[in-house]
Amino acid sequence: MADGVTLVDSTGLHSFSSSPSLSTSSSSLTAVALSLATSASAVTASYSISHLPPPPLPPVPTTMAGWIGWVFSFFFQVIPSVLYWVITFSTITLPTWLFTLFSMSLTFTMNFTTLLLIVLAMVSTISWFIRYRFLNMYSRLPPEPQRKEPQVDLFPDVQEGDSKPGLANYLDEFLSAIKVFGYLERPVFHELTRTMQTRKLIAGETLMLEEEKGFCLVVDGLVQIFVKSMRDGKSDTDEELHHLGAESSDEEHHIDGKQGYQLLTEVKNGASMSSLFSILSLFTEDIQLRENESSGSSSSSIALRAARVPNSIPTSPRGVMDSPSLGFQDHSDDTSNMITNGDLPSVPPLHLGESHTPPSGDQHHQQHHESRKHSSRKRRKSVHPDIVARAMVDTTIAIIPASAFRRLTRVYPRATAHIVQVILTRLQRVTFATAHSYLGLSNEVLGIEKQMTKFTTYDLPNNMRGAALDRLKDKFIKERDRLGSEEVTKGIALHNPSAGRRRRSSSFLRKDAALQVKMMTPRRAATVVTPESAPAEHDTYGVSPGDLLSTIQSSRFGPRYEQPPAKLQSPLAEKENTHFRLPAMQARHTFRRQDTMDEDALFRECILDCIMKGIGLTSSTRDALRKSSHSGDASPKLLSYDSRRQKAIFTNNAFGFIDPYEGSGDGETESLMSMSVTSAGGTSPVINLREELRNDIEIVYFPKGSVLVEQGERHPGLYYVIDGFLDVGVPIVEKGEDLVGVSKPAASKESFPTLKRTTTANSIGAGGTAANDSRRRKQSRKSLYLIKPGGIQGYVGAVASYRSYTDVVAKTDVYVGFLPRASLERIAERYPIALLTLAKRLTSILPRLLLHIDFALEWLQVNAGQVIYHQGDESDAIYLVLNGRLRSVLESPGNKLAVIGEYGQGESVGELEVMTESTRPATLHAIRDTELAKFPRSLFNSLAQEHPGITIQVSKLIAQRMRDLVERPVTEKGVERSNAGGVQTATSTVNLRTVGILPVTAGVPVVEFGNRLLHALHQVGVTNGVTSLNQAAILNHLGRHAFSKMGKLKLSQYLADLEEKYGMVLYIADTNVSSPWTQTCITQADCILLVGLAESSPSIGEYERFLLGMKTTARKELVLLHSERYCPPGLTRRWLKNRVWINGGHHHIQMAFRLTAEPSHPETKRFGTVLKQRVQVLQAEIQKYTSRRIRQTPLYSAQSPFKGDFHRLARRLCGRAVGLVLGGGGARGIAHVGVIKALEEAGIPVDIIGGTSIGSFIGALYARDADVVPMYGRAKKFAGRMGSMWRFALDLTYPTVSYTTGHEFNRGIFKTFGDSQIEDFWLEFYCNTTNISKSRPEYHSSGYVWRYVRASMSLAGLIPPICDEGSMLLDGGYIDNLTVDHMKGLGADVIFAVDVGSIDDNTPQVYGDSLSGFWSVFNRWNPFSSCPNPPTLSEIQARLAYVSSIDNLERAKNIPGCLYMRPPIDGYGTLEFGKFDEIYQVGYAFGKQFLEKLKTEGSLPLPEETEEKKKLQRTMAPRRASI
């Protein structure tokens, strides 16, 4: 019976027979039962044995003996029991259990159906696991929601004023008022304010501003400024104003009743009551308008003055010949006596009338008043006539008298010139720009330049005409015949052999001049002028042919160099021929070589001579200013200066101007206060400008029709017309002339920063489009006036650095002398009389209308973050941005802030609410320190009554503004509702003038980055050029005290001038984080670029903490520098996660850089250090070839110099970005791949990509690597997946929501993009979707790529909507299939829009008022039916879904800058992905043909030549074709 278990299979496996039968005898069954019982008992026995509890431990003893016994007991009793239990369990119990388990026999019975179901269940389980656990990785990605844009920074406005004590408040108001003078050094400030007076005006008291000879400002109170209406007729306003002043009660009633007076403006605390023109008149009272203005009476006055020379001054003919034609000179000799005693001379009133004998005592003042009254009949009585001020409340005003300005002109002439330069600049940027571009007063502004020609026209001498001019023309004619017509249009310049010597820096010239002064010291002893030798010397000077003016002046009386010198003895003749003298020996030497002088050089010298006289460098002004310097200071040192200058002036000063005007050798770094001190000894090195300027003169020939100056550009220099005529005119807009008869002032294509309306279009036309529009505009122009031979073109613009309001075209073949602007700047810097003369001429010819506008316009300085007005405030003024940047913020319920717009230099804000007298719709605050022109509503009302044309002009501007609001893209209207985050208004990227480059942390190569960006901006072509600033450049220009408390004023003025001069300024923060320069870079920036190394730690850097502490509201953008053109997935998100203040987007830039900067003082290298560095180099080389990143580098890159990352960033900053918009259309979107390849081959860069549906897929592929090759491969692979019917069939589901589950579609997109995020794309990218939960469009620029591309491609019914933060997203084409509006809002200037959507069937339907479905089916299959097939239910639903999309598409086609492309792909269906190659070739062929057509038409947006190249072509390129 022991063998009872043999019935079990020997292998121990279970038998699965279908019907086993076991037949045994009863004895055998008994034996089996007995054996089972035996086994059971054995098991029970073993179980009981193995589960016996271990023996109990002996009790714990309490004594030492007990402890020892207890230990022995433990070892001999417990341990053997444990060992016995372990052995029993392992040898008996465990084998018994195993034997019993394997001895059991089980039997299962099943049929085939059951077996098949089991197999299907197993397969289903495995497929479910693979599909939803392995292939479903895209649904298990960590959640990365779209990045929310930070709230607008709007810091609370600091209220200033009443909280300060009286004296501090008084000083603040006074300082804010005199800011109009620009930077004032301490001695200049004291000189200007030491004679200041204050007056108290009671409420209702009137003040005749015509009688107040000084600068008036309101310290405390409120003053209204009234102007006499011109409608009452022009009468003797002087007497009327005197009468009004005598009867204040009548005046009050007169003004209140609006009888003949109109309110101009209201002046509050800290504002000036004087206009800019009145300030200029105070500085320029002693300046002569034209040289020969008073020459008729000069001889008598010279003789009388010569008889009055006091004995204390050496009687030399110099004194006789220096006598001016100004009445001011009558008192200079008297005041020189006072200098010896140290007394301050009394400053008499000055005038520009005829010369007269100086009276004495009270008779002097009476005669002087009569003289002024007599001379005033020839010109305006006052610079501010018919202006009356009335105090509304008790008011305190401060008056700086005119005598302070006259004294300042004498003591600190260079400081005076600086102030005049500042005022002239503000005059152009405030008054002229407002009148010309905003109010449409072009005739008045352009008339100033026309009237200026009467002061600047000087004919060439007779001997330079006739045969000499014919010989000059012959040279040009021969050269013109030799060159082609294409080269001649650039102009032909006469060869100047001395031109090579002029290209030297000013520092070298200063050194040469100083060396020349030292070497000429022995010669001076021989040329000292004594009273005895003076007549002979002057004879020599009178006939010196090397003089700048002697040749011209002598030519008026015939060829003077042929006459004997003895004939030049009359004082008048001597005066006429002593304008600019050379040193005596040099004069004699040049006289001897007169006969051999080159004719071309003589032409240049004569042209320079006429230009000098034209800009005011004449003998009269020179002598007057020199004489005035005698009384310029009370210092006794100037007595020796007076005696020495009689000797030194001949050999040390080529022009004979007063020494305080010369200054020190380095005028850039010396302070203004040191000018008169440095020159007191007469030993300052003076550069002989004469030779320099003569070499700078170019004689250029321009054929008929050549453009010398384009409208809006900065004047290249002065053009002196030798022969021919120049036509000065303005372009006429093709849409029709304005009612005021001028060109459209708010034209968005004008390149100069004039006042214009804020539009979504950039102020600068990009590339070929701007050039093409410019060419079209030039076809129709309005001629204003002609410049005849002897005239100067560009006087006002070139001397004062204005931009041209006109263009200048050669009316005939014209020969001109050209003096570059740089030479004029040198003249203005060394001889301030040029600026003063310009200011005097401007004040003399100013129209009355411009004067009143200038009176009412208020110049404001606003600090960064300061609120100009709040939402809901009363609208009292229009604000024009002169310098800086403003932001308009809408405060919605719930304290949510939304940016409405940003306004840069030249733009205006507030017209709509001012004209409609409504409250402010939004809060306006300054992004950075800003200069504004405040245009009060009272001025507009006054101008509207006098000049209705102004009302028409502003009304047209408001109408255009309203039209822009109505036609604003849907995308911008829904900015605050969209969760796209990255959406910005179109104005936020337009008209950026300053860009700050700030490192995230120390060690970032910002200097190299800034230099590369500067180079890219130069190549892209920023209008008016671009420059960069770092701390070294500032210190070199302003000295080491540039960042001191006083130096900041000078620094701010210098930076404002740079921003006016250049189109863009880069501020590079190359100093440590706490330096003043870093703070300046932050406060001056419209946009801040935070530059970081992508591979370094993304933690917050110290510069960012400093930036946050500054509380700046400027735009902030993140720039990540990559050593290779690859961005790992998720890297950008880590950088942006903690930087909520990045509100302007981010950029990926490839730039090779050194991670560790080289030490300035490298230590001596040891052997170990060298070995370690060598190992690191080898590791880097090996890693370069073994890294996975090498496989991500681009495979294909077009050979285009403008496709670099820095060029892309440059285009974004200057508003010339190129956008690519790809529409949806299913398989037809494969044509996008071909179009993009055609763009690549044409060299057209793409900066921003936006797509819808299949366009978002193709666009994302291109934006990821900015490469065509990987895009082509991935797109073809995806098309293969989509073309598989098996995948579509396997994805079918019960159509409750859609026909498919969407899994295969998701898989195809996810396999293409992986876990990449939109932020990691190399190019900026967005896609649009339709949010059916909130019924709005959404634009996505962050988050996982596959999700939003999948959402943008989700066709309703075919694929289920994708869920995003609780909302359901569908295909973006339902609302907008071609997102040109949104692309324009992102700042793209040129947009390529590729439309591949299906064309709607617009066949007319005539099936009647009711329709039978059976007839519809029959009609569809009836080939003989003439009735069109009615649309099916699905077609009607589809058309209903795309209703709004069609409307947006039609509007997109008409957006300026949009190049609409429609490839011929109508024959392909939406799901025909299998025809990839065919559709691709169609798109490629169409793209090449379309771009070739644009290139032929000249409208292809390729980068055009830069502004510098244009200037070079116009002025310097002729040198290549020189004779």
Swiss-Prot record:
Residue stretches of biased makeup (Basic residues): 370-382
Binding site for a nucleoside 3',5'-cyclic phosphate 2: 841-961
Cytoplasmic side: 1-66, 131-1523
Sequence segments annotated as region (Disordered): 309-384, 524-545, 1502-1523
Catalytic activity: a 1-acyl-sn-glycero-3-phosphocholine + H2O = sn-glycerol 3-phosphocholine + a fatty acid + H(+)
GO biological process, one term: regulation of phospholipid biosynthetic process
One Gene Ontology MF term: lysophospholipase activity
Activity regulation, free text: Inhibited by organophosphorus esters.
Residue ranges annotated for the PNPLA domain, each copy included: 1220-1384
Protein residues bound to a nucleoside 3',5'-cyclic phosphate 1: 681-800
Motif GXSXG positions after renumbering to this chain: 1251-1255
Pfam families found in the cross-reference section: cNMP_binding (PF00027), NTE_Ploop (PF24179), Patatin (PF01734)
Keyword Cell membrane included in the entry's annotation: no
Keywords, ordered alphabetically: Endoplasmic reticulum, Hydrolase, Lipid degradation, Lipid metabolism, Membrane, Repeat, Transmembrane, Transmembrane helix
Residue positions of motif GXGXXG: 1224-1229
Record's keyword annotation contains Lipid metabolism: yes
Domain of life: Eukaryota
E.C. number: 3.1.1.5
Localization per record: Endoplasmic reticulum membrane
Active-site residues annotated for this sequence: 1253, 1371
Motif mapping: DGA/G: 1371-1373
Stretches assigned to the Lumenal side: 88-109
Family per record: Belongs to the NTE family.
Known role: Intracellular phospholipase B that catalyzes the double deacylation of phosphatidylcholine (PC) to glycerophosphocholine (GroPCho). Plays an important role in membrane lipid homeostasis. Responsible for the rapid PC turnover in response to inositol, elevated temperatures, or when choline is present in the growth medium.
UniProt protein name: Lysophospholipase nte1
Organism: Neosartorya fischeri (strain ATCC 1020 / DSM 3700 / CBS 544.65 / FGSC A1164 / JCM 1740 / NRRL 181 / WB 181) (Aspergillus fischerianus)
Highest classification ranks of the organism: Eukaryota, Fungi, Dikarya, Ascomycota, Pezizomycotina
